[in-house]
Each structure stands twice: as structure tokens, then as C-alpha cells.
């Protein structure tokens, strides 16, 4: 009885983990009932009489073809259908060729043909691109060719056999595909997209919490806050094992028709490339995490000497990851992550200046080694974050993400004086110029002497706006820092 309870608890856990699994189970049952109805109801009697025992291939096709996602089902269904068609045609050709060779040579030739096609097809399965997308089709090709050829040796109705075999496979495959697409579809492309965005979010949590965990004493802070932070720091490990899932989902997604915001020939391979860079970052984070949990701990007062730049490097890299996650989830082009990447690189330069000042001259060699290893890892993560940002921009361009930007503002002179009002400008460029027009009359009255060498247009000031997204304006100033001015109701704050 305890074993039954355990199975029930496991079933509840699996269902709660992803409710779509329960729906998928019902979809498979529905497909089997639909195909089986050809045998149990009288109106379909001619169907059973025509196909005979081969009609069972329709049921077998449903069992082996129906997969969790639309892409996987389409891939298997098309593989099975095309392989059955090609193998059936070649099997008929092999049968006819063997018959022309005479009764004595016929069985020998058939055996040789089956051996050659099985050997060659099995060898082709080792090709990487075949293994990835067509492995199941090759297996069905080997099976169907052998069945058609050997059955044809003993059965003169070879054409009927091939036709009924192909027809039943098509019936089963089409049933699976239609139910998979039109009944609560599960799109592999959407799952891949969500997985990649989730991985960005996971790594951002580690980098944002790294400073608090590394520079604060372990016993410091509220217990619940500390425990939550530790859980966030451990979440990155899921990214390390995501390669197989990403590659499988990308493979299935290539079979899927356009759906939602995913157009035809969506750049699924670019998702795999971005995922590979994320795993590289996760491996460096794994090494960085080992120093947090190391038995050999550097005194906090020594860490404090480099706290400001290191905190900024990790937090800005984490913020950049967070922005890229939001960009992917909303499928919009946003350069907000570039701002954080630039700030993290500026923090790297500040760290370099700080190290050159000799601030660590009094640190013990062993402590110096551990501290410098942490610094090196963070610098590597900052550089890798820049590569990831570039890769995401390539993905956004290839996938035609929406250029969702807030209206750029143009300040014009108003009737009340020098205070301007916001005017929207239609533009799709990434860089804009805002012209701020002051009250020329007031300027002249206050600066009579300055008006000799210039015209009224000299009082206009141009501010180069680098980014305008849905939450903020980003402005590049002469001090090298990038400042953010939020927008509210179309006005600058």
C-alpha cells in the first residue's frame, strides 16, 4: 500500500511540475481512439477489409510517432512517412529486379540487396547531421525495405502490400500531427525561447547576489535573506546541464510551422550559439562559487579594499543579463544591456587603477593568490558578458525582434517662456538627437555681449541620446559615465 501511495505522490509531483504532461497523455489516448475506431465501427468495415492486418500499422504509428511537442511529432511523422514511401518504392524495384534474374538467382539477389541497403543505411546513421534529424527515418527505411522485399518474395500482391503499408502509416501520422497541432499544442520553439530567457535570469541572480555573499560575513544578515541568497547562488547549476535540452528543442523547432511570433526560418541555431556562451559563463560562475564556499577564506577587511569595483563589476554584469532576459521574453530590441556592459568595463578600469596604486602590498601571498583568482574570474565574466550581449543582438536582428522604443522627445519653445514641451518623433534609429530650444529673447537680454559673435541658433543645445527604450533614456556624458533619465507620461524627469 505504501508503494501505491509513493507512485501516486510521484504522479502528482510530475503533473504539478508541468501540467502539459497530463494534457499530452489525453492527446495520445484521443489519437489511439480515433485510429482504432476504424476497426470497431461498422461504417469503417471496408477500410479493415481493404488493408487487412496491415491496418495495425496505423495504431503502431500513433504509438511511436506521437511526441510531447509539435516539432518532435512532425519530425517523426515526416521521417516515418518519407522513409516508408522511399523504402516501399525501392523494395518493389528490388522485387522486380530479382524476378527478372530467374528463380535460382532471385533469393540470392534479394538477400544481397537487403544486406547492402541495411549495411549502408546503418553506416549513414553515424553521420552527425543524419543522427540529429533523420535517424528515426533511416531505421524505418531499413525495416520497411526488408519487409517489402522479403514479403514480395513469397507474396505476389507486392503492390497491394506496399500501398496498404504506406496508407496506414499516413493515416496514423496525419492523426498524430493534426491532434498535436490543434489540441493544446506544445511548441518546442517556445520552450527553447523560454529556456534561454530563464537561463539568463538564473545567471543574473548569481551575479547580482555575489557581492553580498562575498563581501559580507557569513553570519551577517537576516537568516531567511541569507538562505534565499544561497539558493539563488546555487540556481546557476541548471544552466550547466542545459546543452542537451537546448539542442533537442532547436532540432524539433526546425520542423515546426510558423506560430505566434516565430516566423518561417526562425534562427533557432542562433539560440544554441547563445546558449553555448551562457554555459561558458556558467562554468566560470561555478569556479567563482567555489571560492565563496572554500575552506580557505580571506578576511573581510582585505576583501573590502577591492569591494567597490568588484561589487560593481558583478552587479552590472548581472543587470546586463537581466536586461537580456527581459529582451528575450518580450522579443524586443533593447540596448539597455549595453549600458550595463559599459559600466562593468568601466569598473574593470577602476579596479586596474586601484591595483596599480599598491593597495594590496601588505596582503599575504596566499591571500593575494585567492583574491586575484576571484578578480580574474570576474574580469573574465565581464568580457564574456560583452560577447553574450553581441550574440543576443545578432539573434534579435535575425529574428526580427520588435524595435520597441518610447517616443523620442523634441523640446520646442512654448508660449510660457523657456520651458519646452515633449513632442514625439517617429524614428526607427538607435541614436537620436534632442534639440533643446531656449527662449532666445531671454538669452539675449541676459547675455547682450555674447550675442555679437553668433546667431540665435547658437543657443540651441544638442544632447546625443544613445538609447530610448520603454523605461528610460540613456545619455552619454563627458565624464565617461552613462546616465539614465526615466520617462513618465512622455516627459523627462
From Swiss-Prot:
Output one GO BP term: monoatomic ion transmembrane transport
PANTHER family from the UniProt entry: ALUMINUM-ACTIVATED MALATE TRANSPORTER 10
How would you summarize where this protein is expressed among tissues?
Expressed in roots, but not in shoots. Detected in the root apex in absence of aluminum stress and in root apices, the stele and endodermis of the elongating zone of primary and lateral roots after aluminum stress. Not expressed in cortical and epidermal cells.
Q: What is the effect of changing residue 375 to I?
A: In strain: cv. Cvi-0
Q: What happens when the gene is disrupted?
A: No visible phenotype when grown under normal conditions. Lack of aluminum-activated malate release and shorter roots when submitted to aluminum stress.
Q: What is the effect of changing residue 194 to F?
A: In strain: cv. Bay-0
Q: Where in the cell is it found?
A: Cell membrane
Functionally, this protein is described as follows: Malate transporter critical for aluminum tolerance. The STOP1 transcription factor is required for ALMT1 expression.
> Any other noteworthy remark?
Essential factor for aluminum (Al) tolerance but does not represent the major Al tolerance QTL also found on chromosome 1. Acts in parallel but independently of MATE, an aluminum-activated root citrate transporter.
Tell me which residues bear Phosphoserine.
Answer: 320, 327
The activity regulation comment is:
Activated by external aluminum.
Q: Name one GO cellular component term.
A: plasma membrane
Q: Which family does it belong to?
A: Belongs to the aromatic acid exporter (TC 2.A.85) family.
**What's a Pfam family this protein contains?**
ALMT
Phosphothreonine modification sites are: 385
- Regions of biased composition (Basic and acidic residues) lie at 441-452
| GO terms assigned for molecular function | malate transmembrane transporter activity
What's the protein name? Aluminum-activated malate transporter 1
Record keywords: Cell membrane, Ion channel, Ion transport, Membrane, Phosphoprotein, Transmembrane, Transmembrane helix, Transport
Region of interest (Disordered), residue spans? 441-460
Induction and repression of expression? Up-regulated by aluminum. Small induction by erbium (Er) and low pH stress, but no induction by cadmium, copper, lanthanum or sodium.
Q: How is it modified after translation?
A: Phosphorylated. A reversible phosphorylation is required for activation.
Q: How does it sit in the membrane?
A: Multi-pass membrane protein
Q: Does the keyword Cell membrane apply?
A: yes
- InterPro entries, alphabetized: ALMT
Amino acid at each position: 500500500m505504501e508503494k501505491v501511495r509513493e507512485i501516486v505522490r510521484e504522479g502528482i509531483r510530475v503533473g504539478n511540475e508541468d501540467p502539459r504532461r497530463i494534457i499530452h497523455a489525453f492527446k495520445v489516448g484521443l489519437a489511439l481512439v480515433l485510429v482504432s475506431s476504424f476497426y470497431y465501427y461498422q461504417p469503417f468495415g471496408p477500410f479493415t477489409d481493404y488493408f487487412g492486418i496491415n491496418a495495425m500499422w496505423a495504431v503502431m504509428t500513433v504509438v511511436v510517432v506521437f511526441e510531447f511537442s509539435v516539432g518532435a511529432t512532425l519530425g517523426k511523422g515526416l521521417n516515418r512517412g518519407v522513409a516508408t514511401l522511399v523504402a516501399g518504392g525501392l523494395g518493389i524495384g528490388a522485387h522486380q529486379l530479382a524476378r527478372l534474374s530467374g528463380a535460382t538467382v532471385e533469393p540470392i539477389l534479394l538477400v544481397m540487396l537487403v544486406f547492402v541497403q541495411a549495411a549502408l543505411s546503418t553506416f549513414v546513421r553515424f553521420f552527425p547531421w543524419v543522427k540529429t534529424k533523420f535517424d528515426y527515418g533511416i531505421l524505418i527505411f531499413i525495416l520497411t525495405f526488408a519487409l517489402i522485399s522479403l514479403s514480395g518474395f513469397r507474396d505476389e500482391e507486392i503492390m497491394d502490400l506496399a500501398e496498404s503499408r504506406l496508407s496506414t502509416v499516413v493515416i496514423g501520422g496525419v492523426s498524430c500531427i493534426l491532434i498535436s497541432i490543434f489540441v493544446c499544442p506544445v511548441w518546442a520553439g517556445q520552450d527553447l525561447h523560454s529556456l534561454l530567457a530563464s537561463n539568463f535570469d538564473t545567471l543574473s541572480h548569481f551575479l547580482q547576489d555575489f557581492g553580498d555573499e562575498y563581501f559580507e560575513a557569513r553570519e551577517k544578515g537576516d537568516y531567511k535573506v541569507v538562505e534565499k541568497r544561497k539558493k539563488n547562488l546555487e540556481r546557476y547549476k541548471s544552466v550547466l546541464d542545459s546543452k542537451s535540452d537546448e539542442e533537442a528543442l532547436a532540432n524539433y523547432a526546425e520542423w515546426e510551422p510558423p506560430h505566434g511570433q516565430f516566423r518561417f526560418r526562425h534562427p533557432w541555431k542562433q539560440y544554441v550559439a547563445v546558449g553555448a556562451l551562457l554555459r561558458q559563463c556558467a562554468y566560470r560562475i561555478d569556479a567563482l562559487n567555489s571560492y565563496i564556499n572554500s575552506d580557505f577564506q580571506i578576511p573581510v577587511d582585505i576583501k573590502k579594499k577591492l569591494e567597490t569595483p568588484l561589487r560593481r563589476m558583478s552587479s552590472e554584469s548581472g543587470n546586463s543579463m537581466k536586461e537580456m532576459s527581459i529582451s528575450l521574453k518580450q522579443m524586443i530590441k533593447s540596448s539597455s544591456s549595453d549600458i550595463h556592459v559599459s559600466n562593468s568595463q568601466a569598473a574593470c578600469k577602476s579596479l586596474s587603477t586601484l591595483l596599480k596604486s599598491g593597495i594590496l602590498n601588505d596582503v599575504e601571498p596566499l591571500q593575494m593568490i585567492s583574491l586575484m583568482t576571484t578578480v580574474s574570474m570576474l574580469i573574465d565574466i565581464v568580457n564574456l558578458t560583452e560577447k553574450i550581449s553581441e550574440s543576443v543582438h545578432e539573434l534579435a536582428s535575425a529574428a526580427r525582434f520588435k524595435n520597441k522604443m518610447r517616443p523620442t522627445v523634441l523640446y520646442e519653445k512654448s508660449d510660457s517662456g523657456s520651458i519646452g514641451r515633449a513632442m514625439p518623433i517617429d524614428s526607427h534609429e538607435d541614436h537620436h538627437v534632442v534639440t533643446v530650444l531656449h527662449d532666445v529673447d531671454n538669452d539675449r537680454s541676459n547675455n547682450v555681449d555674447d550675442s555679437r559673435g553668433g546667431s540665435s541658433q547658437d543657443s540651441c543645445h544638442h544632447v546625443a541620446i544613445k538609447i530610448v527604450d520603454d523605461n528610460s533614456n540613456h545619455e552619454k556624458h563627458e565624464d565617461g559615465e552613462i546616465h539614465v533619465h526615466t520617462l513618465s507620461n512622455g516627459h523627462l524627469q
